[in-house]
Amino acid sequence: MYQGHMQLVNEQQESRPLLSPSIDDFLCETKSEAIAKPVTSNTAVLTTGLDLLDLSEPVSQPQTKAKKSEPSSKSSSLKKKADGSDLISADAEQRAQALRGPETSSLDLDIQTQLEKWDDVKFHGDRTSKGHLMAERKSCSSRTGSKELLWSAEHRSQPELSTGKSALNSESASELELVAPAQARLTKEHRWGSALLSRNHSLEEEFERAKAAVESDTEFWDKMQAEWEEMARRNWISENQEAQNQVTVSASEKGYYFHTENPFKDWPGAFEEGLKRLKEGDLPVTILFMEAAILQDPGDAEAWQFLGITQAENENEQAAIVALQRCLELQPNNLKALMALAVSYTNTSHQQDACEALKNWIKQNPKYKYLVKNKKGSPGLTRRMSKSPVDSSVLEGVKELYLEAAHQNGDMIDPDLQTGLGVLFHLSGEFNRAIDAFNAALTVRPEDYSLWNRLGATLANGDRSEEAVEAYTRALEIQPGFIRSRYNLGISCINLGAYREAVSNFLTALSLQRKSRNQQQVPHPAISGNIWAALRIALSLMDQPELFQAANLGDLDVLLRAFNLDP
């Protein structure tokens, strides 16, 4: 169990390569040796037993016996009376079973292969004395629509033929008695099948007629198009005619959910107060002040920038992406927002978009934009929010731009350029080179806690969890309220088997989020679901069912008391 969970968390950090591993990715990953827990909305990660369910359909026993009898019948001649009877009985049973129940395609193909071996084999009996019997057998075969496993005279010796004729002559009545019930059942199944096919055919015809009628109604579609265009035009006019003091909402802003009961929405100097709280490490309150600043001035690109960066540090990546996108709509050359957006895209596995943001960073940078102009015919990136793996040629093209820019700088180190290089090496899985790039940036900015966190995440993804703990610890020394780094530290503790320390870090992060919001008397505190999910995993590894139940219920006070932490 220990090994399974260790591999689980390692896979998670690889799937979220830069700032932090998303708990959602390894909520779907399970191991067979884990202990099954009660199924709730919050414990999907622990219900591991369901992943091992074999959904393949078993082969029915009668068909298995029938299939086994076929090869043996091929090798033996019709020497005894019972042989002929058994052959027909098994064949009739096989055909009836094939029509009665649904089987897998592989099973159907397997039976078809056995029958096709004898497709060209015919039984030519004595047409004078036994003609009526052969006519009856051929009639039965044609009515049922299946192939009889009959033996060719060319494949048997003369004594065998005489013996076979004698057996068929004496047992003709029993053969027909056995074939008749099977024939009746097969005929009934054919009627049902024909009725079903006829019904499906009529439904298909009805659907095609309805589809053709709708497609041919061009007047209807032209009217719908005209109404849609008119509605869009009216909305555009009404938005432009709004009063100047009213807050307009763009498409990006609609994707961002502001706190409805923000006590600072009318606070004078909300942006400056937000910067002050950010330096103090009070991330939840910083977010409230930045939202207030934006509500007062929706066109404040810098407020959107800091809102996005703070949301990322507060372990809320989706809100960060929306805020940073809005910032870049207002200010396309905002280099800090572009780099932060590239990091957030990387964390959410949007590799194509991360490459595009990094390329735009070069294009918008006055020091390096000439490099893009010199690269004629470089592949463009037009896909938005795509989680498919980045094209290797595109990634190599952007990486080449950054390496060329670094070469142009000579001995001078540009920390922002090195940060971009670190992200690119991360995307390509070159963790050691990414570590070198982040270390180079830290030589210029040793007090940049976000760089220390990125270095820690890179070390962790490079299977160097002990060094990652040191990097995360350094980031928290500089910024104690850095919730994302606290979360990452907990993940690395799980990797190292230090489950109690992991729980302590997760609880500290949750407590920081709640404490900050409670001090401002803001209802419904926003606490990261990722942290709660990681906490449940750590508690399950500690084999603490009572505490695990408290985590399921979101009872933070019980958990804090259990681990002797201040509420």
UniProtKB/Swiss-Prot annotation:
One of its GO terms (cellular component) is membrane. GO terms for biological process: maintenance of protein location; regulation of membrane potential. The modification Phosphoserine is found at residues 146, 194, 198, 202, 386, 388. It comes from Mus musculus. Interacts with RAB8B. Forms an obligate 4:4 complex with HCN2. Interacts with HCN3. Interacts with HCN4 with a 4:4 HCN4:PEX5L stoichiometry; reduces the effects of cAMP on the voltage-dependence and rate of activation of HCN4. InterPro entries: PEX5/PEX5L, TPR-like_helical_dom_sf, TPR_rpt. It comes from the Eukaryota. Belongs to the peroxisomal targeting signal receptor family. TPR repeats lie at residues 267-300, 301-334, 336-368, 415-448, 450-482, 484-516. It is a peripheral membrane protein. This is PEX5-related protein. SMART domains: TPR.
